UniProtKB/Swiss-Prot annotation:
UniProt cofactor(s): Mg(2+)
NCBIfam families assigned to the protein according to its UniProt record, in alphabetical order: miaA
Site (Interaction with substrate tRNA): 107, 129
Protein name per its UniProtKB record: tRNA dimethylallyltransferase
InterPro entries for this protein: Dimethylallyltransferase, IPT, P-loop_NTPase
Keyword terms, alphabetized: ATP-binding, Magnesium, Nucleotide-binding, Transferase, tRNA processing
Top class in the EC scheme: transferase
Record EC number: 2.5.1.75
Source organism of this protein record: Geobacter sulfurreducens (strain ATCC 51573 / DSM 12127 / PCA)
Length: 311
């Protein structure tokens, strides 16, 4: 189906900031092209974290096969290397059935790792790392993310503001070498990229995107987000887990601990999500391979582009 013997597997990648409509576009394209949807969002891999990660609705999931959602528990440290392995396996399986893989997500690091591999980077410095870990505990991961944005904006744009492990690592590399981690990654040229990719980015006006984000967060709280977080805590998952430090979960944990009001938590989730979306856009805009499209306005032309690509 559009892949000649010996040629690379064709892969459509739908990117864009949070709340831009990626999940629905992925399903509609999969229906039009005879495809399966593959998750590329670092938070949607976790079981039991549904509302706060804005997983595709049961109605969307019922329309076409979805892969790599709900695959690990929240206390598992699921890395970009883990993702590359699992996604590669799933894409091979989809292709073997004569179906077409449609990758969808906002985690730039996952997508970059899948299609290009992991770049070599310097070793570790235990002293520097210990100091950064202490800063993360006292100031919070978001403060370190702001610090990273000053010295390595490309890495900061790619990482969740609460992704403490990777933020600490990026700062550690810079403090050790004086060189941004993103530069090490940029210098890493991939001898054999395994996929022939069509990257589609959903273009959204910033004001419209921020409005969508605010509405989505209100909807999340109305649909039981606080109860979801409370259930995870009651199940024994620590608020200190990497997954529980994600935007939304961290703020609701603070509300449940009594350190802020419900309204304050909601407003913080909205603000932090808007900031994250802005950084996602910064990251995606730097990729000249992304073809920007308007959705849902131009679905027919998007579908035509994808069909022509698959052949």
């Amino acid at each position: 189906m559009g892949n000649q013997a010996g040629s690379k597997t064709k892969l459509v990648i739908i990117q864009g900031p949070t709340a831009s409509g990626k999940s629905e576009l992925a399903v509609r394209l999969a229906e039009a092209c005879g495809g399966d949807v593959v998750n590329a969002d670092s938070m949607q891999v976790y079981r039991g974290m549904d509302i706060g990660t804005a997983k595709p609705s049961p109605e969307l999931v019922a329309r076409v096969p979805h892969h790599l959602y709900d695959i690990v528990d929240p206390d598992v440290n699921f890395t970009a290397a883990d993702y590359r392995r699992e996604a590669g396996r799933v894409i091979t399986e989809i292709h073997s059935r004569g179906k077409r893989p449609i990758l969808v997500g906002g985690t730039g690091l996952y997508i970059k790792t899948l299609i290009g591999g992991l770049a070599p980077s310097p070793g570790a410095d235990d002293t520097i790392r210990a100091e950064l870990e202490e800063d993360a505990r006292s100031e919070g991961a978001a403060a370190l993310h702001d610090r990273l944005a000053q010295v390595d904006p490309a890495a900061a744009a790619r990482l969740h503001p609460n992704d403490r492990v990777r933020i600490v690592r990026a700062l550690e590399v810079f403090l050790m070498t004086g060189k941004p981690l993103s530069e090490f990654q940029e210098e890493h040229r991939f001898a054999d990229e395994p996929y022939d990719c069509l990257k589609l980015g959903i273009s959204v006006e910033r004001d419209d995107l921020y409005r969508r984000i605010n509405e989505r967060v209100n909807r999340m709280f109305a649909e039981g987000f606080v109860e979801e977080v409370s259930g995870l805590l009651n199940a024994g998952y620590s608020p200190d887990l990497k997954a529980m430090g994600a935007i939304g979960y961290k703020e609701v944990c603070a509300y449940l601990a009594g350190t802020c009001s419900l309204d304050e938590a909601r407003e913080l989730v909205q603000r932090n999500t808007r900031r994250y979306a802005k950084r996602q856009l910064t990251w995606f805009r730097k990729d000249p391979a992304i073809k920007w499209v308007e959705y849902p306005a131009n679905f027919d032309s998007i579908s035509t582009i994808a069909m022509k690509f698959f052949g």
